[in-house]
Amino acid sequence: MQNSNWYKFFKNIKPEIISFSFLVSLLWFIRSPLKNTTELLEFEVEPKTIPFNQEFLNQVYEKAKHKYIWNYSPTQIIHKLEKLINTRIRI
């Protein structure tokens, strides 16, 4: 047994590496059930009345390039873009 390759291999491994590999395997095992709970962290902003195509987004970006609406969260940007479209203000 002591002359086997596996015994020599495990004998030469440092305890830190073994504990690190155990921790990684434990975290990997825990990650699997928690995989579906990350849906709570994801959110999607659904556009209400804005037609999102590339041409429209380019027009909006050109109009709002000099305004500071891009410093807001996605929902605030959506509301500001809706306000721009509804009031039809020329920027």
From Swiss-Prot:
UniProt KW Plastid keyword: yes
Keyword vocabulary terms for this entry: Cyanelle, Plastid
One GO CC term, this protein: cyanelle
Origin: domain of life: Eukaryota
Subcellular localization(s) per the UniProt record: Plastid, Cyanelle
Chief localization: plastid
Name of the featured protein: Uncharacterized 11.2 kDa protein in ycf23-apcF intergenic region
